[in-house]
Amino acid sequence: MTPLNQVEGRAIPLGLKNIDTDVIIPAHWLKTTTREGMGRGAFESLRADPDNLFDRPEYRQAPILIAGDNFGCGSSREHAAWALGDLGIRVVIAPSYSDIFSGNAVKNGILPVVLPQAAIDRLLEVAATDPVRIDLEHQTVTTPFQDRFTFEIDPFRKMCLLEGLDEISLTEKSDAAIGAYEDRLDAERPWMRAVVG
């Protein structure tokens, strides 16, 4: 997973409430186990409109998405985070998220920032013409107009994003400790080695 510390760029000013995982990635895209290409299906129903935000040149490579309340609600599908990541989104800013989506986002290198609605409204206004900057280390969202918003994040999630650690790489970090534990168990209970094989 690519580490995330600072992200700056255009933000897609979606602003819609209750965007569920079926809107983020429709069910017919869930037949794959690979992340590559999932961005093509991201927000498919919204992208049917020829004037949709996602395909406008100014937002095509945007690393930030600004959404409304309850983003990522609905069914639990990690494919939603895969689709956002494949679309190039590294940060989603919204007033609230589904707990499952929020966890899946972090596990896939996407920072879910929670800000109050007044801050969202200001960022939607700025995003129409100017970039937004997110600094995870300092937990801030800033604009070129001296707007500065702070956000909270669980320290463990913050560490995982800053270091680019998913569940596998986090476990691999403890490889030496796991090996030492297994060696100690083998010495304390040699009969277990024979049972396990």
Swiss-Prot record:
Its EC number is 4.2.1.33. It holds the Pfam family Aconitase_C. Keywords: Amino-acid biosynthesis, Branched-chain amino acid biosynthesis, Leucine biosynthesis, Lyase. Pathway: Amino-acid biosynthesis; L-leucine biosynthesis; L-leucine from 3-methyl-2-oxobutanoate: step 2/4. GO terms for biological process: L-leucine biosynthetic process. It is an enzyme of class 4 (lyase). InterPro entries: 3-IsopropMal_deHydase_ssu, Aconitase/3IPM_dehydase_swvl, AconitaseA/IPMdHydase_ssu_swvl, IPMI_Swivel, LeuD. One of its GO terms (molecular function) is 3-isopropylmalate dehydratase activity. The keyword Nucleus does not apply. It catalyses: (2R,3S)-3-isopropylmalate = (2S)-2-isopropylmalate. It comes from the Bacteria. The keyword Lyase applies. GO terms for cellular component: 3-isopropylmalate dehydratase complex. HAMAP family: LeuD_type1 (MF_01031). Catalyzes the isomerization between 2-isopropylmalate and 3-isopropylmalate, via the formation of 2-isopropylmaleate. NCBIfam families: leuD, PRK01641.1. Heterodimer of LeuC and LeuD. Belongs to the LeuD family. LeuD type 1 subfamily. This is 3-isopropylmalate dehydratase small subunit. The gene is leuD.
